[in-house]
Amino acid sequence: KIFTSIMVGLLWIVNISFAQTNISGNVSGTWTVANSPYIATNNLVLQPTDTLIIDPGVEVKFDGNYRFDIFGTFLAVGTESDSITFTRNGSTSWMSLNFADDADDNSQLKYCIIEHGTQSGYDPYWGVVNFNLSSPTISHCRISNCSNDGIYLHYSEAEVSNNVITNISSEGIKLNQSKGTITGNTLNNISNTSIHLQEYSDSTQ
């Protein structure tokens, strides 16, 4: 009985250790802790009519220089004690979260850790979190150790509040022809301007 109990315990540990979900292409539905981490093996797309809910505690790891293009409803809402993480899987930086013009303005990033990203490499996505012709909310997130801009707004009225943005190689928050609500953010170790208003931009701070 003792041997059986030990074997069952070891099998349970092995199952937990190897629990992961590989993802690529079109995604939707609900991502749960039970199936975490989610490993992106190629670019990800959330289509305009689809919804993705990411539960607190989930880790999303990009297994290469891949991006996530968001056209639908995206709800990554963690908690103060149980964040959602977007990071690299290994030593190669991933690209970015790109909220495009069809993205639902009710989309949210809240209590997320976003790290080791870089720019997507094509206009108008010059940050690690990008809002292009869309106005979701990002709050209580930590964005760190990223190349190029931390958060980039392009023709956007996004709410950007109470985030920590640190160790960024370009601008912390950049607004290009945008009017965002930028409040309560902490920015440090930013290579260039912490908050850059570019080309007829304005913000409530």
Protein language model regions, located:
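Beta-strand/loop edge motif enriched in small/polar residues
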Residues: 17-205
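Bacterial N-terminal signal peptides
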Residues: 4-15
